[in-house]
């Protein structure tokens, strides 16, 4: 496990009630398990997961004449990966070796920004909002079977079959 986190609070622009808060974190988690079922059967599982994020939140309170206002900004950038694999290794004879593998992977990415402004006068309150989020991911499911067959010491025959299913999801909110 690898993890790193940092938060940084800073004074605002000098106005009372103004503040900035930003930070980032990175983490990774990975592991592997091997299990020997018998001399001819082995099972392997491996997994990786990582998530990274950076963010900035700012609030600015201000006033002029008879107007009291608050500006709020939120922004973030994030991305991550998940990868898992399950493999079954089977040796039906000393001349044949079979690997069957199932895999899953996903990558996602996020960029988001939001702005809100509220201004109040003795007679009115005005709100303005703007935000967007770009969220994108790629997800894969796959499986394959690989066979190594050695009919005699001078020949090695390799064959197999595999398939993969891709899902692409780009988007803007």
Regions found by a protein language model. Give the residues of each.
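Periplasmic-side early beta-strands and strand-to-turn transitions of outer-membrane beta-barrels
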Residues: 1-77, 113
